[in-house]
């Protein structure tokens, strides 16, 4: 077993080297510098990789270097780059570049942004598209909020691999671990919750069983994809539709809209069923089609809670009316 790593923050870097010394590992295996612009392990491949990159941190200071490498068809960022305000998905591409051909595994902790930020055709969406269509995303586990010292936001563990077990091929497992916690007796910064060893084991077993239940959902890769289709409507002038020189209708750019059509749907059939009845004169400009991917995690675990009955609400109001000494009755009678 050989442990290696890289850290940008000098303080954290020093702590890591000290920990390596205490553990009997070689502290020289820990390097100082940015993984994005100063890769100390260029060309090296690893079996297992774990990281918790900074949440929502700008990479503008390294933009020139990253943009240049993204032009290289063999570079780490060849698929695309996210917006410069959040470099999370750059770190994931960095790790994927270090996967062994015979199979590697990655565990990376993100906030919610990499799951859905960016519309079809954007850098973020193209990166998700590449990862999912190449069947590398194995599982996403949502964690409770308030488990980090310096932030109370919800976080997610992505498990990425280039060698899935046969039953997981073409599938993505989502695990809702947001309720797997116990409150701490004393807060530590923003950290007010912790995951017990029993709860950790329960999450691990949920992952290994690979079954659908209240906390686990399994989807085909294609489920997360959509085609963003541009919908046009004719330009009307003096009560008449305007045509172009080629005889085709001229679109009204002010009425231009788009539809996200799931990849599991036939685009033409969806358009006829969902759009045409409401916009009978509309048409699709298929030359502008863009395929995107997103994971709307909360939506998949949403559980409908029925509204209280009118009788229950009335009963409560009458009880309040009694307590308020007839004020409610006076208002209603008026």
Predicted regions mapped to residue ranges:
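Conserved SAM-binding motif I beta-strand of class I
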Residues: 3-7
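AAA+/P-loop NTPase substrate/partner-engagement loops
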Residues: 8-10, 39
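Short alpha-helix immediately C-terminal to the canonical SAM-binding loop
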Residues: 11-15
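Conserved SAM-binding strand-loop segment of SAM-dependent methyltransferases
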Residues: 25-35
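Short conserved loop adjoining the S-adenosyl-L-methionine
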Residues: 35-43
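A conserved structural/catalytic subdomain of Rossmann-like adenosyl-cofactor enzymes
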Residues: 43-329
